[in-house]
């Protein structure tokens, strides 16, 4: 599929069955027996054709994970949309490195790709094919347009086409705009023209899509149009030179006020509801209520070497146990750089203690587990109510006691190790180093010592992995990312008993992103509310920390904070390159990461790398097209 004008009809390609319990409810169509009239004879048959439009973003061909690929000249597994989105939007940034030596792959993180790169070409072909499928569906389904359900189908196909063009505009900028089946060579459109098309399509279909939450899981409703408009307008100033932050705020608000909501269901009981978003049962564990547009995967019925199968397998290696992630083996590929790890940083103990309230008291902690040791002085606690005290403190392995005014005349330990204070009692053991929240209640003569819950979004495997990277081809250099897993909330492996293919669905747009769009647009001059922005970000951080201990105030909210929060919340979800470009950090020397510009410590690169080259084959076929600058 080497030409956007080489229109492949859905009728000629046939259909793959992507029907499964968590996918579009459709009857599979035998690709060897149907005719065009059969496929579009009624709404139910048309729904099968619509499934192919959706599946063009999830699957790679007509014969399971390999055998009859939609796109040639690249390994079929590499050709899946979200796998290529990872390669172009995450691997090119501080979020990811990969160990493999496939030709052209290391060029992406090193930022020295050229025209003809297999991966930049294949993404163009994949998106062009999605446009082709959508165009074919829209034209052929028009004959059934009197059926209300088919009207919804057409609006959904238009959304998928707009989403494909959104990505073509982001990645390649200047592409042909093709909306009808045609054999004529199209002219080249610029970014403004593509932007205008995507905007007009989304605005037109917002009231033609189903209402919020009324469509079946796996199909979009009008909130998807609002959320994509939110993303579009956030990038408008970067792409077309015109700020559209008020519009970003408006459509973000529509999405935020819809039936979708942030998942707060900690179904596996580990203290945070964040990880549920990326488990094998994320279509039913509560995460689905946050997913506005997602790719559905099923380890038995919609197999691919892309999607979450890639994200999970490629990130497992070294001393990691594949079974812990619901798979049969790791591919020893993807890791992250210290830049992402350091976004989570160390807890600000001073800020945590300021959040306690109350006043500094004469009671404190002493012991070899404290920073000052047994010789003191005591680390003073805060009196939060009469005879009630609290403190965040970093402790080492050892022992502590409570002491008054640096004087052993009044001290408390715990002789029975039962949480009860005893005057002059035994030392209180601290088994593991870390940050703790310590309380003392002299009204009831009790105390608590609880580990501080850090940001649960920091999902890294560090055993045998170095933080520093000197050779990207070595899997043990760089922390492994454990964000995606093929296990459910009960720890059970996905439906593929072999452990080869994942059930985990992949969110392409979720409500958390819209929250962050709103905050950034407000800070950039949009007519949103700073108070609302803080509240929405604190929703995300409360989920991440399992409490309000990580919450921020308006004084903490600035553009760089939002960028870092986007990194913490959305890493490996296909947005990082676009974010860095919007902030002016992608190609510049002002923000570096390991092997940016193919140098160990990173270096700036030419600004033309903000967009990728058009495929040489496309330009050779179509004399109307010019290569992007720099290539």
Predicted regions and their residues:
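Short acidic-aromatic linear motifs embedded in glycine-rich loops, typified by GG[WY][YF]DAGD(H)
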Residues: 21-156, 160-171, 176-193, 261-357, ...
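Short coil/turn linking the two alpha-helices of tandem helical-hairpin repeats
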Residues: 169-170, 176, 235-241, 524-527
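Hydrophobic, small-residue-rich alpha-helical packing segments that form membrane-like cores
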Residues: 181-238, 243-266
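Insoluble glucan recognition modules
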Residues: 356-451
């Amino acid at each position: 599929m080497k030409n956007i004008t080489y229109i492949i009809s859905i009728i000629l390609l046939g259909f793959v069955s992507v029907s499964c319990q968590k996918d579009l409810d459709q009857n599979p169509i035998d690709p060897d027996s149907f005719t065009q009239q059969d496929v579009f004879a009624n709404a139910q048959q048309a729904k099968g054709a619509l499934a192919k439009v959706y599946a063009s973003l999830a699957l790679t061909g007509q014969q399971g994970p390999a055998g009859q690929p939609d796109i040639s000249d690249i390994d079929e597994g590499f050709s899946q949309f979200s796998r290529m989105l990872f390669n172009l939007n995450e691997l090119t940034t501080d979020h990811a490195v990969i160990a493999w030596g496939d030709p052209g792959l290391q060029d992406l993180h090193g930022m020295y790709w050229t025209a003809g790169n297999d991966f930049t070409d294949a993404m163009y072909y994949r998106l062009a094919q999605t446009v082709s499928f959508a165009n074919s569906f829209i034209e052929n389904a028009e004959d059934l347009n009197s059926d209300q359900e088919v009207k919804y189908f057409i609006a959904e196909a238009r959304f998928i086409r707009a989403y494909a063009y959104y990505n073509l505009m982001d990645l390649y900028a200047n592409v042909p705009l093709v909306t009808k089946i045609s054999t004529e060579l199209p002219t080249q459109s610029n970014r403004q023209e593509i932007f205008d098309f995507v905007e007009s399509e989304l605005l037109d279909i917002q009231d033609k899509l189903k209402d919020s939450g009324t469509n079946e899981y796996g199909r979009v409703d009008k909130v998807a149009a609002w959320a994509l408009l939110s993303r579009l307008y956030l990038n408008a100033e970067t792409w077309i030179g015109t700020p559209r932050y008020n519009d970003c705020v408006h459509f973000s608000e529509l999405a935020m006020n819809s039936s979708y909501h942030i998942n707060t269901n900690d179904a596996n009981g580990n203290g945070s509801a964040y990880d549920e978003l990326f488990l094998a049962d994320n279509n039913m564990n509560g995460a689905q209520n946050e997913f506005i547009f997602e790719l559905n995967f099923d380890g038995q019925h919609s197999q691919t070497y892309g999607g979450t199968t890639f994200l999970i397998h490629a990130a497992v290696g070294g001393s990691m146990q594949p079974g812990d992630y619901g798979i049969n083996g790791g591919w020893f590929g993807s890791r992250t750089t210290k830049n992402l790890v350091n976004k989570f940083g160390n807890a600000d103990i001073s800020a945590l203690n300021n959040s306690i309230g109350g006043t500094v008291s004469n009671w404190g902690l002493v012991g070899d587990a404290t920073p000052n040791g047994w010789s003191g002085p005591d680390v003073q606690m805060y009196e939060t109510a009469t005879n009630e005290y609290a403190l965040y403190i970093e402790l080492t392995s050892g022992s502590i006691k409570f002491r008054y005014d640096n004087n052993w005349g009044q001290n408390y330990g715990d002789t029975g190790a039962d949480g009860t204070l005893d005057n002059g009692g035994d030392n209180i053991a601290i088994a593991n180093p870390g940050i703790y929240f310590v309380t003392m209640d002299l009204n009831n003569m009790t105390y608590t010592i609880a580990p501080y819950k850090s940001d649960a979004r920091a999902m890294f495997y560090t055993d045998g992995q170095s933080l520093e990277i000197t050779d990207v081809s070595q899997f043990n250099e760089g922390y492994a990312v454990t964000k995606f897993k093929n296990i459910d909330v009960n720890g059970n492996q996905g439906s593929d008993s072999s452990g080869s293919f994942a059930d985990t669905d992949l969110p392409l747009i979720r409500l958390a992103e819209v929250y962050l769009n709103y905050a950034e647009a407000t800070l950039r001059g949009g007519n949103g509310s700073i108070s609302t922005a803080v509240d929405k970000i604190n929703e995300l951080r409360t989920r991440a920390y399992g409490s309000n201990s990580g919450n921020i105030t308006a004084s903490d909210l600035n553009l760089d904070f939002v960028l870092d929060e986007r990194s913490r919340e959305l890493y490996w979800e296909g947005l990082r390159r676009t974010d860095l470009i919007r902030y002016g950090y992608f190609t510049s020397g002002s923000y570096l990461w390991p092997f940016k510009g193919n140098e160990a410590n990173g270096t700036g690169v030419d600004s033309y790398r903000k967009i990728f080259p058009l495929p040489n084959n496309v330009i050779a076929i179509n004399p109307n097209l010019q290569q992007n600058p720099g290539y």
